[in-house]
Amino acid sequence: IRDRGEERFILAAGKSNRDYDFLVDALKDTPYQVRILSDAYNHPNPGSNIRIYHDVFGEKYYQMLSECCCVIVPLADARISAGQLVFLQAMMFAKPIITTESDTVRDYIESGKNGLIIPKQRDALRDAVRRLYEDEALYRGMAKEGRCRFLENYSVASMARRIGSIWRKLDEKKC
């Protein structure tokens, strides 16, 4: 698990079903530096602590993900499944995740273990960020748990093990 880095910043990425207005409104003019990566989002005045980037993909995206403190996925509609790829990538890089409630986030995030699932309320988001910034044990525990979950459940090696197990069971039934 990497240190949080010299310049601590929060990363938010993706475009499907995101509510970046909520994120900007909640964290604008706070001490937290925020980087939003989305070709689909613009804001006329996000505040001096929030930067919006377009056309960030591949290696540049992974570089920013590796350097961030944590990842926020603010979802617009709780009934729509979204954010899974960002969840997996954050866990791959051992980054705690803060996300707003939805019907499917619990398939990836266990609140208090590898991230925080919050109601879409300004104070709830600010409190979640504050907790990760101030509580080193919580931060490191969530980072480690997220990385372990990724390796155990979502990595190429874990998928290969599961596929191999299925093939072995199918092969045993032939005899």
Label the model's feature ranges.
Residues L23, Q89-M91:
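Short hydrophobic faces within alpha-helices
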Residues F57-C68, M92, E110:
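Short acidic alpha-helix that forms the nucleotide-activated donor recognition element
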Residues A124, R131, L138-N153, M159-S165:
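A short, well-ordered alpha-helix in the C-terminal region of glycosyltransferases
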Residues A40, D77-A78, P96-I97, D103-T104, ...:
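Flexible glycine-rich beta->alpha loop in the catalytic core of nucleotide-sugar glycosyltransferases
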Residues N45-P46, S102-G112, L116-I117:
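Short acidic/histidine- and often glycine-rich active-site loop of Leloir-type glycosyltransferases
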Residues D3-E59:
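Conserved catalytic-core segment of nucleotide-activated headgroup transferases in glycan assembly
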Residues L65-A82, K95-P96:
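Acidic donor-binding loop of glycosyltransferase active sites
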Residues S111-R122, R131-E136:
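Conserved acidic donor-binding segment of nucleotide-sugar-dependent glycosyltransferases
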